[in-house]
Design a protein with these regions (language model features):
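Hydrophobic residues in alpha-helical segments
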Residues: 18, 41-42, 112, 190-193
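Short helix-capping/linker segments at secondary-structure and domain boundaries
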Residues: 44-47, 83-92, 188-195
Length: 200
């Protein structure tokens, strides 16, 4: 869980609760650091460098934030989720990835004028026997449930042929949500000691 959603138990949902569904779309805000930064840029009219320093001071961003702000972190997460959901291995190197380094306060103001906001989304969709994934900043309208996902929170939207639409929501940045997910993974591994787990 810690590798994908911070405090969101999305991997267990895909591996257990949704095994009867044929998943055809996963879209989400998978990086709490960049979501925090974009939220601050939107609400406080701050520039990129200012909010990055603030995120680092609060422990949300690493000393080297390249993987977060460049989109690589979200890219790796959508690769993992897509591989689990579709049953086919997806190399993260094959995913088009664009981060938030070029987003300016002017972009945020333009989005507001349109009644929208800018979010860094990771998305993948099944198309026939194959699937497509990408990570990039998107304009998100108020009708989308992702519009209201602010601050350090993450959200993953999943669409299945029987489930329909579902959204998983939780804290996605900071040491405590990640630590909680790591402990959960360790406990899960301990419960399955000496058990062979067959994967395709």
């Amino acid at each position: 869980e810690a590798s994908c959603g911070g405090g969101i138990p999305i991997i267990r949902a895909l591996n257990s609760s949704l095994t009867a569904d044929e998943i055809d779309e996963i879209t989400g805000i998978l990086n709490g650091t960049t979501n925090y930064m974009l939220y601050k840029m939107s609400t406080e009219n701050c520039d990129f460098d200012t909010v990055l320093k603030e995120a680092q001071a609060k422990g949300y961003a690493e000393a080297d934030p390249t993987a977060d702000v460049g989109g690589a972190d979200a890219c790796r997460k959508i690769a993992i989720l897509s591989s689990l959901a579709y049953g086919k291995f997806l190399k993260y190197e094959d995913i088009y990835t664009e981060g938030i380094t070029k987003i300016t306060p002017a972009d945020m103001e333009y989005a507001k004028e349109l009644g929208m906001t800018i979010k860094l989304l990771a998305t993948s969709r099944r198309i026939g026997d194959s699937f497509y994934a990408m990570v990039a900043p998107f304009l998100v309208g108020q009708s989308s449930p992702l519009y209201s996902v602010n601050d350090v929170f993450n959200a993953v939207f999943v669409h299945g042929n029987m489930l329909g639409d579902a959204m998983f929501y939780g804290s996605g940045a900071g040491k405590l949500p990640t630590a909680s997910a790591v402990v959960g993974d360790i406990v899960d591994a301990a419960k399955h000691l000496h058990v062979n787990i067959v994967t395709n």
